């Protein structure tokens, strides 16, 4: 899509999202928040930011309430963008929600298998991944029933074709389903962004390639010490990314963390994640890299990638706020700045 037609169809949305991005909290705000002695002080500090009085009607504050209210703000922003979207952006935003749908499905299946309360599970589902038949997941007893009764009418149905050979819904099979769904979803989203082309592809393909690589690394590490075979593991790797296909073939044969490090050594940024002298965890490195890639999306104009990037940056901001609030509650303010700053 050329710049003129993009501006005609989506210029307002791009300006709106860039306005949201410019209001993300800066480092000095986090520093001020980390010095708060109570959550009341925390509320007061946030009142001078774009969050304004979003906690004004909360008589009792907890980190969970702060997270929930901040997420409500994000949902309102996402909904406003979606209401203004043209057909292509609307489909792009649908793809964004599919990841939350998968997460909700896995949350309900895992919780049901472990005997958790259905009502509590449904309350924990992410609103962006809600669909009409979601509550029926709690009574599914096998994968065929899960597909034919609950998911066949959802956008995720095509992703399930490689899951239908699974047996009963035990914890290991649920993990296999999760990773198989994500593989199909990421490959589909990647191809959709390639089809859009132009700056949307330029910004989104590196982001999705990183996500594919992160999943391949995580799947490998989490499979150690389980009954998952190397062949089954390899089938769950997305078929794109900077690690694909050479490094993923090494990951498929990996037997320990050292093998994973060797597989990632050909990609400089990833090899740094395994620096033994670093005090950061692998997840810390992943989160920092994700923020870096999403910030880069705002350096280009006339593309849909900033919608995805803003959502991910706002989610990291919410995690930062929740962490600081929890540190204040637990009287561990010395740990409050163990976050991933954005601006």
From Swiss-Prot:
Keywords, comma-separated and alphabetical: Hydrogen ion transport, Ion transport, Membrane, Transport, Vacuole
GO biological process, one term: proton transmembrane transport
Subcellular localization(s) per the UniProt record: Vacuole membrane
UniProt GO molecular function: ATP hydrolysis activity; proton-transporting ATPase activity, rotational mechanism
Gene3D superfamilies: ATP synthase (C/AC39) subunit, domain 3, V-type ATP synthase subunit C domain
Membrane topology, as annotated: Peripheral membrane protein
Domain of life: Eukaryota
Annotated Pfam families: vATP-synt_AC39
Function: Subunit of the V0 complex of vacuolar(H+)-ATPase (V-ATPase), a multisubunit enzyme composed of a peripheral complex (V1) that hydrolyzes ATP and a membrane integral complex (V0) that translocates protons. V-ATPase is responsible for acidifying and maintaining the pH of intracellular compartments. This subunit is a non-integral membrane component of the membrane pore domain and is required for proper assembly of the V0 sector. Might be involved in the regulated assembly of V1 subunits onto the membrane sector or alternatively may prevent the passage of protons through V0 pores.
Subunit (UniProt): V-ATPase is a heteromultimeric enzyme composed of a peripheral catalytic V1 complex (components A to H) attached to an integral membrane V0 proton pore complex (components: a, c, c', c'', d, e, f and VOA1).
Descriptive protein name: V-type proton ATPase subunit d
Organism: Schizosaccharomyces pombe (strain 972 / ATCC 24843) (Fission yeast)
């Amino acid at each position: 899509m050329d710049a003129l037609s993009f501006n005609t169809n989506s210029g307002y949305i791009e300006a709106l999202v860039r306005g949201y991005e410019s209001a993300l909290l800066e480092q000095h705000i986090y520093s001020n928040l980390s010095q708060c002695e109570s959550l009341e002080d925390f509320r007061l500090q946030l009142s001078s930011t774009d969050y304004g009085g979003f906690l004004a009607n909360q008589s009792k504050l907890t980190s969970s309430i702060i997270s929930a209210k901040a997420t409500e703000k994000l949902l309102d922003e996402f909904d406003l963008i979606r209401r203004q979207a043209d057909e292509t952006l609307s489909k792009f935003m649908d793809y964004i929600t599919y990841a939350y749908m998968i997460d909700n499905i896995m949350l309900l299946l895992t919780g049901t298998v472990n005997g958790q309360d259905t009502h509590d599970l449904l309350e924990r589902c992410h609103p962006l991944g809600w669909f009409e038949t979601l509550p029926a997941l709690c009574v599914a007893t096998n994968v065929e029933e899960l597909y034919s009764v609950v998911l066949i009418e959802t956008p995720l149905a095509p992703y399930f074709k490689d899951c239908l050979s699974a047996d009963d819904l035990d914890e290991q099979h649920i993990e296999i389903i999760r990773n198989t769904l994500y593989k199909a979803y990421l490959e589909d989203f990647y191809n959709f962004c390639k089809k859009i082309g132009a700056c949307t592809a330029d910004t989104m393909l590196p982001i999705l390639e990183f996500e594919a690589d992160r999943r391949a690394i995580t799947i490998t590490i989490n499979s150690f010490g389980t009954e998952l075979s190397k062949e089954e593991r390899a089938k769950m790797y997305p078929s794109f990314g900077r690690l694909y296909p050479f490094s993923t073939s090494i990951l498929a044969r990996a037997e320990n963390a050292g093998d994973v490090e060797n597989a990632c050594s050909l990609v400089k940024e990833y090899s740094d994640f395994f620096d033994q002298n670093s005090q950061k965890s692998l997840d810390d490195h992943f989160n920092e890299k994700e923020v870096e890639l999403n910030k880069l999306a705002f350096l280009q104009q006339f593309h849909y990638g900033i919608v995805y990037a803003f959502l991910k940056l706002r989610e990291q901001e919410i995690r930062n706020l929740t962490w600081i609030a929890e540190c204040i509650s637990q009287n561990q303010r010395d740990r409050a700045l163990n976050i991933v700053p954005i601006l």
